[in-house]
Structures are given as structure tokens and as C-alpha cells.
């Protein structure tokens, strides 16, 4: 029953539910010969077509039905980006069950907590994760059986995992005569949990309708701009926010899909980019660091790679400039979150921006960007009053839209909405053209003498220094100012830079009082399950750090 008033005169259009199964049916019918290429855990390259994917997805759906999986049941996966994982995406959701992607980079205790909280019925996993599943299986109370994604001859002779089945046996033992059911498009389709950097992870439960609307919007020219002419390699994991929706939006267009499997090092990625003529990719900044280092160290170039979307955390401007100016790769800076399916904004230029000087255009592209249709946003102060869009005033960022959650799974956290808007936890500015720029996570903002200091700008400036590989900025207690910035730096291999040189590097680039009070050098920044820097770990490490100004 709709919550909105019903007109006395309704449109006379066909009523067809927006269901995930319609995407793979469309891909098979109209792009059936187009390729899906995967580097497998087994080590080889696997090739087949959208037609093959649809056929095997239906077989898997029939097998799951035979195991007693019903509409609304949760079926978990723990797998890399690959063809079998794609089949599970469509088989589970297409049958009316709920696909629950598990992040293997979480702590085992968190994985057990999530499977129990989701009440998963089955877990489909890849050979890489056999030891992990053997360790946690006894703590997963609701799982009835485990399905191992591997060739038949790779099945373990014995295992402590109860009711362990072979994925390929299930596929081979069922016919491809399964018919995708029709049901309400608002039915749950997928379940993704937050990374849980503080407290237990919380679940975001997507619907078929929200997923298809997100897929439509994300393929638009001023969003991800995916087309049938592309060869797409998603580096962002399928176990993290559904790989930003690419397993849906790419088949929707019929583009070639290339999956990297477990090999995400610079050389492996580069080799696959070149061999499969990849034109478009997507991933977090830390992944591109490894790829760019490999390319630079071996004096290589890209022959077909022309466009990438970078998100998950703010992309350093120095990286954007390297990709754009040195390698001719268009970088689309994007922003979103698990609670948003995840896409919210993309930084692409409007027509009048091309009249601006090059530096001004670059500044626009460094922002998180403009909303895609379907998403609305605003910034508010701590009282909830809306703040101006002047590009200077920063406030708490709120969003709403048809692919934004209304609550967490099972009501965790209570009523999360603020007057119908979802509070993102980000602090941002919005300029007169509607371009949003994250200045910080609200929990990461440094509060110094009653004023806010955003850490992202400080980190980006540091990473533009040639000797700095990575940087993170945190607030450290100060007897007079409450908090002051401490810059934590990882140097590039074989290069040196002093604290004094780095602090001097800020001169003229920011307000003087924003300049960090101290610099600490470490070997590596702690990285979390989704590729983001774990600032809570850094804060814990430097909790007792005494600033020279204290």
C-alpha cells in the first residue's frame, strides 16, 4: 500500500516489477555472446559468455531451491571477484532469497557475529577461504551447509566443515530449466554490512527496486558512464557494497567484464588490463598506489585504459594528476557509502566549467562531486539548521533517496533518520553549483580552540610531497587548544624527508593555524577491511604522544 495519495486517473502502462533477474535475462538475450573473463583462484584464466552465466545461474538457483532455500532466506558468499561469484549474485537474489556478501578481511569474530545476526542458511565460499571457514564454522549457528566454489578435483579429502558440498557438483546435477519467479520489487535482494571499525557491523538491506534504480543511475554519462563499448575490470571487491553495483550495471549495458580474482598486486592487475584491453575500472586509492608504482618502476604505459572511478576514501590530488596528466586516464572522484548502495556523487565537469582555467577545473574534479539523479543532499549545523551552499561553510552531510536505507537491518541503532534524512557522519561543503566536498568524517575532525580543522586537506598536501607515500592526520590532546594536528607519514622507498621540511611544505597552502604541530614517521598505515586507513588504530598508537607545542 503506497504512503502517497492516489490520483483518480492512473497511467496505462505495463506493470512489470524491477527485479535483479531481469538484468541477467537481458544480458543473455541481447548480449549473450559478450565475454566474461576471470582470473581464478586455481591460477588460470576462465572465459565464457553472458549466455553461459545466465545458464549456470539458473542451475544454481534450482540447486538452492532443492536445498530448501526459500524467498527471504539469507545465503552468504565469501568470494573474490569472479564468474562463480557473479552467478551467485543472480541465482540467490533472482530466486527471491537474499544475497549476503561477507568480507573476508573482517576479524573471524566479526564474521561469526554477522552470519548469526543475518541468520544465514548457507554459505558459498572460495577455496582461498577454506582455513578461515574451518575456523569459524563451529560458531555459525544458523548455517545448514557450506558450498565450496572450486573444481571437483580441488575439493579437500576431508574437512572439519559440516555438510560441505562442491559448487560444481551442484551446478552439474541440475538442469537449466529454472524459471525466475516474479514477486514484489520491494522484496529484499541483498544484505551488506558496514565495516565495523567501531562496534559491531550493521546491516544495510537493499531491495530489488533500489538495486535496479541504482544500476540505471550509475550508468549515466555523468556518473560511471558504463557502455557496451567498454571492457570493465572492477577492482573494488564484490564482497564490499556489491562492488559499487558494477555486477549489475555492467551486464545491464552488455559490456565485457574482467574479474581479477585474488591477485590485486600491481603486476597482476597491469597484465590483465593489457591482455583484456580494459577501458574502465573502479577501486579505492590504495589499490591504485600499487598499480602506479609497478607502472612507474617498469617504465610502462596503458594501451586501452582510459577511465577510472576512485572512491571509498578521498583520492589524493597528486594521484589524480598522475593518472590524468602522465597516463591520460580520466579520474572520476566518487562518493557514497554502504547505506547508499553505495553511489551518491560523482565529480564530472559541466559545460560552463570548461571555460575555467585548468587549475580551477582540477579543483572541481578533486571534490566528491555532484549528486546523481535520485539522491538529494544538504548540510546542517549541530542544531539541524540547513547551511548555505557557498563552498566554504561546512556542516554535517545528510542524504535521502530511493537507494538510501531507512533503517539498519533488524533495527540496529534505532531510528537513524533525522526528519527523513540519513546522517552520513561526514562533514562537507557544497558550492553554488551543487558540488560537494568532504572535509572529514565527523569523528575525525580536529577541534582546536573551538574551531574545526579538516584532516583531508592536510593529508592531501602532505601526499603531494614527492617523498611521501601515505599520510594520515589525527587530533592529539593539547593543554590549551584541546586538540592539535599530528601528521603521521609513510615515506616513499629510498627517499627521505624531515619533519621540518614537511611542516614548511604547508606554508602558503593553508591557514597557518591549521599547520600540524608535529610529524611522526611510521613504516605503514593500518588499513581496514575495505581499504580505508584505520584512524582509530592510529589514534590509539599515538594516544600518549606529547606535542612539542604542549
Language-model segments: residues:
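Conserved beta-loop-beta connector loops within the AMP-binding
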Residues: 370-398, 432-433, 495-499, 534
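AMP-binding/adenylate-forming catalytic core of the ANL superfamily
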Residues: 106, 112, 123-127, 281, ...
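Conserved AMP-binding/adenylate-forming core of the ANL superfamily
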Residues: 36-82, 86-90, 107-112, 166-169
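Conserved adenylate-forming
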Residues: 64-70, 174-187, 191-233, 245, ...
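Structural core segment of the AMP-binding/adenylate-forming
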Residues: 23-24, 66-67, 94-169, 183, ...
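Conserved AMP-binding/adenylation subdomain of ANL enzymes
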Residues: 212-231, 239-279, 294, 345
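AMP-binding/adenylate-forming catalytic domain of the ANL superfamily
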Residues: 149, 511-532, 549-550
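Gly/Ser/Thr-rich phosphate-binding loop
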Residues: 252-255, 275-283, 292-363, 376, ...
